[in-house]
């Protein structure tokens, strides 16, 4: 219902603009929706460099198993940077205590549980119709070493005039360097995540 909620918010706030952020499929779907509804000029649309989206069923049942055993989940992060950018910590909070979710993360990175469409994603390219793409700037220590931050560097790809406008609004708050698509190459800007050879076996066992 998020598209309708956004549209209703824009109708209720005719003098305001809105920032929509989502995965490539979500953001391009919203782009088409906003064009049909005639509100494209009031929204900035940003998508994320995406590894793929896991099965909602898998997370729902995994979370339910934790809550049934330990209590209600009140917080979730997959990228806590206490150990640095390259070794993120994933955990949930239950009753104020941190509980690791390593099993779920392992399945995610093993490429067993992504949605079938993710393995054929048409948005795994630098040519996108959103205003801007954001993501981790992996390997920046090799291409722009003097700008590397062990806590992480973000990558912005600007696609449209709206994207330029958005960047101009925020650039005063940023420390940034200009790059190019060769320097900032990321695997999921070129091709979708490959399906694991163990995917079918995983779901049969699940």
Predicted regions located by residue number:
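Short active-site oxyanion
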Residues: 15-19
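Gly/Ser/Thr-rich loops at beta-strand to alpha-helix junctions
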Residues: 20-30, 52-54
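Short, charged, surface-exposed secondary-structure boundary motifs
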Residues: 52-61, 145
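Long, compositionally biased charged/polar accessory segments in the mid-to-C-terminal portions
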Residues: 71-206
């Amino acid at each position: 219902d998020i598209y309708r909620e956004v549209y209703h918010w824009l109708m209720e706030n005719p003098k305001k603009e809105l920032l929509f952020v989502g995965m490539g499929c979500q953001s391009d779907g919203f782009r088409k929706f906003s064009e049909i509804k005639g509100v494209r000029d009031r929204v900035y649309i940003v998508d994320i460099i995406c590894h793929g989206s896991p099965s909602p069923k898998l997370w729902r049942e995994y979370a339910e198993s934790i809550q049934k055993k330990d209590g209600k989940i009140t917080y979730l992060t997959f990228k806590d940077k206490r150990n640095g950018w390259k070794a993120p910590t994933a955990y949930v909070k239950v009753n104020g205590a941190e509980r690791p979710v390593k099993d779920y993360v392992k399945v995610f990175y093993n490429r067993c549980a992504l949605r079938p469409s993710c393995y054929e994603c048409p948005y795994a390219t630098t040519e996108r119709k959103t205003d801007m793409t954001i993501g981790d700037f992996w390997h920046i220590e090799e291409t722009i070493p003097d700008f590397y931050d062990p806590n992480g560097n973000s990558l912005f790809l600007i696609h449209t005039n709206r994207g330029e406008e958005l960047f101009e609004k925020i650039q005063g708050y940023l420390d940034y360097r200009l790059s190019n698509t060769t320097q900032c190459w990321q695997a999921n800007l070129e091709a979708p995540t490959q399906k694991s050879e163990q995917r079918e076996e995983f779901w049969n066992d699940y």
